[in-house]
Amino acid sequence: ARIGLKQGLLMLLSGQKCGVRSALKKGLIDEIVPKAILFQVACDYIYGNTPALRNVKNRYQKWVLKRENITWFRRYLIEQIEQQVWLKAFDNYPATKAILTLFKQRQENQPSAESECFAKLFQDKTSKVLRKVERTNREMRHQYHDLQDAGEIKKVAVLGSGFMGAGIAYITAARASLPVRIKDINPDGVQKALRLSYLLLQKEVELGHLPYGKLLQKIYLISGGERFIGKQRADIVIEAVYEDLQLKQNLIEESENYYDNDTIFASNTLTLSIAEIASKAQRPQNVIGVHYFTPVNQRRMVEIVPHQTTSQATIAKAIKLVIEQGQVPLLVKDSPGFFINRILIPYLLEAYYCVLDGEAVGTIDRALQEFGFGIGPLAMIDEMGLDILIKALPKLERCFGGRFAPPKKVDNLLLNDRKGRKNRRGFYLYHSRTGDRTQVDKSIYQVLEITVENNLEPEQIVRRCILMMLNEAAYCLQENIITNQNEGNVASVLGMFFPEFRGGIYAYLDEIGAQTIVAELMLMVEQHGERFQPCEWLVTRAAQQAEAAA
């Protein structure tokens, strides 16, 4: 065995992708050679003109591999890995169960058994759904391969050094290999942003995804300070500051006065209209929305939001940058909340309503994780920042009504200084040094003045939260926020961790059916109020389905 049972099984079960340097480090491959001499080196290995192929390096590794071949230990190891996988996948992926079964059985004709298993899984519904999502993902990346209007991008500036600004700077340097300048009036914030980038790059080195020699090359691409440096040298300026229209307009003015006439200004706003932000610009055709999601290095979806007078060259250059950063672009209509947050926020709020109704934080998050989400809704609120979410609600409520009304007692959380991961205080407790989520902060119930009763079944919690999301997704189609449902499916998977094996938000909507959704929403209206009122698009589609079935 090259890497042993444990490592090999974990790679198979997670579907982990492995770069060549990581593969060399793990022992999956023997050598990395230049393309020009690849054939010759391969021949040397075949004919024995080189040292023996990679073997176990030390006595400890030999002992580990020998131990893994002991029957009782092998069985114990597989059971432990099975428990780990179940905690993450919750039996939602048939392939994981099939792989574990094959490893347990250890048949004599193992290759034949694996081939039969693969053939069955390939025809499975989950496999077809996953392949469709991946195919659409690739299409979204490649449909913009010929961006003739984009021009060359040589340097990027980021305004704001918070988690968002730091994340944008990191992917610009690490993935796009572009120089990036972080500007912020707070020097400490800039230092934290630079440190975050260094830690993320260091992690890439540890995982074998980045050669150590390139770490310093990447980190030297990032600079920061209180002022712009490099007269007229930024091709794109990305603002990642808090939601204040006047502030964003002032930043446009400052950037326009400093940089060239063709410099693009990209706003990372959550709720403000891009047209409003651009209304006082000298060159509104250069203003566009480019909306990332926290944590930027993990959430690969980026919304591209042009307003009515945004030029095609600006759109092309924004899309080009996003693709170079390794992200997936989604063109959306200029409307508060855009697409991802528009469907995400009602789902998050409903989870909070469940807390107010006496459900435990851990129970709610676990129920949605068993449904297939990579992270529970309340943990996601902590990631987003409770203060940011609450500040966005009044604007969204004015535009879309009571579905976005601030729930009761949210002020209690703000007064208790609970902003989530960024200040280590939220629905969860966080490690003081690493910032990793540890456990539910049970004092949250006292702050909200509630008693945990856990009256709801997990299925009821899931139904309440998912119905709000499905209804809002239908509103987005009704209002032409997006026009392609397949792209909406990929966006929901990449942007908010909607279960990939369910095919995305619109695939799941079609699976349940508009008739069922409308009926359940009307029942929820009776139980919980008007926020569950089904949208016209759903009602019309339900009527059409009923008529077709008659």
Language-model features: locations:
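N-terminal glycine-rich phosphate-binding loop for ADP-containing cofactors
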Residues: 1-550
